[in-house]
Amino acid sequence: MALLSPRVPRLPLASASAAGAGLRCCVSGGRAGSAAWCHASAAGSVASSSSELEAIRWGTAKLQGARDEMEDEVVLRPGSLLDGFSFAAVFDGHAGFSAVEFLRDELYKECAAALDGGAVLSTKNLDAITDSIQRAFATVDANLSTWLEQMDKEDESGATATAMFLRNDVLVVSHIGDSCLQVVSRGGRPQAVTNFHRPYGNKKASLEEVKRIRAAGGWIVDGRICGEISVSRAFGDIRFKTRKNEMLVKGVKEGRWTEKFISRINFKGDLIVSSPDVSLVELGPDVEFVLLATDGLWDYIKSSEAVALVRDQLRQHGDVQVACEALGQIALDRRSQDNISIVIADLGRTNWKELPAQRPNLFLELTQAVATVGAVSLGIYISSLLALQ
């Protein structure tokens, strides 16, 4: 199948090797067969002295997958526009592309202004950074809601977002929704920097989302807020924010619930919020690369597998872009039904040719693939049981 350009051979996944060290993390906040769009870029040049910071090499990929439309987007601004920080973000749209289209241009600008051109990032003060980014996200969401209401009364699109500000020594991540970021040490062990904001599952983050939604007057059916949407933090989605009452009336007309049912509903807040979790990771010398992707990847590939694949690809040829495309190919081969967006930032510290070859464990790969799909279904089932209590 002509899924990627250039064509990437299908490679067996390799099991992850022993863990390394080198990072410290702080957290704040609460068809197959479709065309693919891929991009690559590099920031700077390789340092001539070991005391200098090496280059960050970037690879990005967007794959439409089985969806009729492409609602994902990748934004990459490498270089030193923000006091030496590069910016990268993935947006996962739903119910249309309007929200993503707005965010593609506006989120970076608002964050850059709130962060004082990157000066706040350089302080490494997590409280100050969190406050700035949360204000920026709130402003963007308010502006987006106004824009959606003025543009089309029927436009109820939304989008999740994971954005990172990366310098060779530090990483700042801001996140809402169900995209995910991984930070990897030289040993190849992934550390998740973000949590999924979903109204189902038995993890602490999911249970907190369920509690917040119920406190706001919402309910969850089959892992979906009001039986409609399976993500609990996002930009846009005005029917769960400024148009909640209109949503109730529309639901009665469509036969999804009754007048008696909505008479008992008392909304006390937004059911979907845009407040991001913000994390700061100081990057030690053993951190190899950063991997950022939408859930079209993570629902079908475990983080340990993704890390192992990227490391093996870079060991073979050192091409970040080809590694990015190969990772997307694996998700498509596993019948991912969603759009997929991927960003990889190689910090340029690793001599990939010196890494020993990793031996594939085909049995482990098969069982992990089955477990990944099963875990999603199990999480929805557990949340449905909790909703009935």
From Swiss-Prot:
Catalytic function, reaction form: O-phospho-L-seryl-[protein] + H2O = L-seryl-[protein] + phosphate; O-phospho-L-threonyl-[protein] + H2O = L-threonyl-[protein] + phosphate
Organism from which the protein derives: Oryza sativa subsp. japonica (Rice)
Gene Ontology molecular function, alphabetical: magnesium ion binding; manganese ion binding; protein serine/threonine phosphatase activity
Entry protein name: Probable protein phosphatase 2C 5
Keyword set, alphabetical order: Hydrolase, Magnesium, Manganese, Membrane, Metal-binding, Protein phosphatase, Transmembrane, Transmembrane helix
Disulfide-bond pairs as recorded: none
GO cellular component: chloroplast stroma; membrane; thylakoid
CDD domains reported in the protein's UniProt record: PP2Cc
Transmembrane among keywords: yes
Subcellular location: Membrane
Record field: transmembrane: 366-388
EC number: 3.1.3.16
Binding site for Mn(2+) 1: D92, G93
Cofactor binding note: Binds 2 magnesium or manganese ions per subunit.
Keyword Transmembrane: yes
Sequence positions that bind Mn(2+) 2: D92, D295, D338
Superkingdom of this protein's organism: Eukaryota
GO terms, biological process: photosynthetic electron transport chain; photosystem stoichiometry adjustment; signal transduction
